[in-house]
Amino acid sequence: MKHILNLYENINSTARNNSDCPAVILPEEIFFTVSIVGVLENLMVLLAVAKNKSLQSPMYFFICSLAISDMLGSLYKILENVLIMFKNMGYLEPRGSFESTADDVVDSLFILSLLGSICSLSVIAADRYITIFHALQYHRIMTPHRALVILTVLWAGCTGSGITIVTFSHHVPTVIAFTALFPLMLAFILCLYVHMFLLARSHTRRTPSLPKANMRGAVTLTVLLGVFIFCWAPFVLHVLLMTFCPADPYCACYMSLFQVNGVLIMCNAIIDPFIYAFRSPELRVAFKKMVICNCYQ
């Protein structure tokens, strides 16, 4: 993950020397456009929750946490492309102190985005579990203050972990730990899911109205999790292949799709707000009010 400004050249060289697959190069305009749209969409989510007291509940606080993670992923790509552009124009000294510092900052944003997304999805899963199976005690268990404390601890842990990963990113154990977080957290969420839906079936037989009223949030989380896996898994696989088999022709062929995998990550930031709006009538109404007010102003 170090020297991200030189990553494209390394991938091009690897793909050219070890396989018949040329590196897929996408126009920088695509990255800028997708990243800017992702930032604006998730900023709308944050503003909608901030401006509407009806949305200021633990569930939407956790959604805001996921939106912040998506924004960081988009900002990472914007900053990375700007730095690459400056380097190509000769404004950055190759491997100089400023480039090294900028590289660390950009890498930190990227890793923080991934860690924040995984942790936010885990917290949302736990919140949905409490909502469905402890509905009567939910407002006592999950207060807004408690939700904010959870998010503070979550982001403090993600920040510390992100800095540690960037600092020791040239060590293979760090790469293994980084990539292991992805399947471990997903395994936790999936286990919670299996338990959740098995209990939901039994609850449906006894009290049909109770789980049906709250299962919408679980379905929303299912969609969010599916999109997250689809968008991030190709990059995680890329990191593993780049670490353990960079000279293998088949690995090099897959790594030639690095920029495509990068666009997939950016698309995650664009898709998530549409999922929020489609699954949440309250958030959809807040979006409409914001758009109408801005148009009339």
UniProtKB/Swiss-Prot annotation:
GO CC, one annotated term: cytoplasm
Gene Ontology molecular function, alphabetical: corticotropin receptor activity; G protein-coupled receptor activity
Protein modification: Ubiquitinated by MGRN1 that may be involved in post-endocytic trafficking and/or degradation of internalized receptor.
Tissue expression pattern: Melanocytes and corticoadrenal tissue.
Pfam families: 7tm_1
Function: Hormone receptor primarily expressed in adrenal cortex that plays a key role in regulating adrenocortical function. Upon corticotropin (ACTH) binding, facilitates the release of adrenal glucocorticoids, including cortisol and corticosterone. In addition, MC2R is required for fetal and neonatal adrenal gland development. Mechanistically, activates adenylate cyclase (cAMP), the MAPK cascade as well as the cAMP-dependent protein kinase A pathway leading to steroidogenic factor 1/NR5A1-mediated transcriptional activation.
Subunit structure: Homodimer. Interacts with corticotropin (ACTH). Interacts with MRAP; this interaction targets MC2R to the plasma membrane. Interacts with MRAP2; competing with MRAP for binding to MC2R and impairing the binding of corticotropin (ACTH).
Protein name, per record: Adrenocorticotropic hormone receptor
Record gene name: MC2R
